[in-house]
Structure formats: C-alpha cells, structure tokens
Amino acid sequence: KTSLDPYNGITILSEDLPKDILEFEQNLKDLIQNVKDNKNLIWIYIDIKKSDFIPIATKFGFTFHSCNSDYILLVKVLKENAIVPNLANHTLGVGAVVINSKNEILLIKEIIRNEYYKLPGGHIDDAEMISQALSREVFEETGVVVDFERIISIGHFYPHQFHKSNLYVLCL
C-alpha cells in the first residue's frame, strides 16, 4: 500500500510493510521496477521493530532521511532532478523576558554552566507551540507562572547542537 506525495513520490508506511524480510525484499525490487519511470522518489518509514529491513532498503539505493525514537525514514531518488526536502535542519529554543511590577527582569543561573546569568528558557519540544514552551520552561526553571504575550526577537546561530542551526525565539 502506498500514497502519493507533493514531490511526485510514493510513501510506504511501516504498518503496510510485510512481516517477512524476503517478501519485503521482493516487493521492494518489484516496486522500484514498476515506478522508476514515472515517479521521482520512494519514501519508506521503517519502524524500529522492523529495523532488519534497513540493510535491504539501503542495498536498493535508499538513503537515510530522518528519524524519530521509534522509526527511520528512508528515501530513494529515482530521477536526477528530484527534490528531496530537508528535514530537521534547526533546533529551536525559547527565551523569556519576564518583567515584574517593579520593572525588575527575571534572570537565572544554569545548574551546570552557572558562570553567568541568563534569561529563563530552553528547548522547544517536538509538537510544542512556542507559547507552551515558554510557559513550561519558565515554570520548570523558576517556579514562576507566566503567560505568553508576543515574540519580540528571533536569533539564528550556527553551528549549534548536532551540527545544526539554532533558532532562538525571544518572547515577552
């Protein structure tokens, strides 16, 4: 079972893969032969429980695209000019400017790197809104409950963790 994508590719979900590795290999070989002339890409999500399928896919020219804790997404480029969109090329962080009624600004010291003061904030989790991350990070680091008002600045830093860029969103 496959689905079409905006890049003239087809996507195969892990739950639609056969249980048997030999059947997977034959199905993949047949699929490539059947679509190589009219599709640009083939995407395959492989669940961690089927990780023994990965070497089979790479043998057929699939490369690693992205992953999560329980799956990997592989892609095979069938046409030279095919567009393969990048994924996860930034980490995201949020910082909070918290000013009280006395016009005092809230600063913290990190537990590990505590040689300087900084604004409370941190990593924006996967599928988390900026406003949620802001409130969560300030509360986790200070115990103070805040409400997101607005974004006041965005910073871009490279290199950062994992050889990626970082977007730092500063909020009130």
What does each model-found stretch correspond to?
Residues 53-95:
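Acidic, metal-coordinating catalytic segment for phosphate/diphosphate chemistry
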Residues 78-119, 146, 150-153:
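N-terminal strand-loop-strand
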Residues 92-94, 143-172:
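Active-site segment of metal-dependent pyrophosphate-handling enzymes
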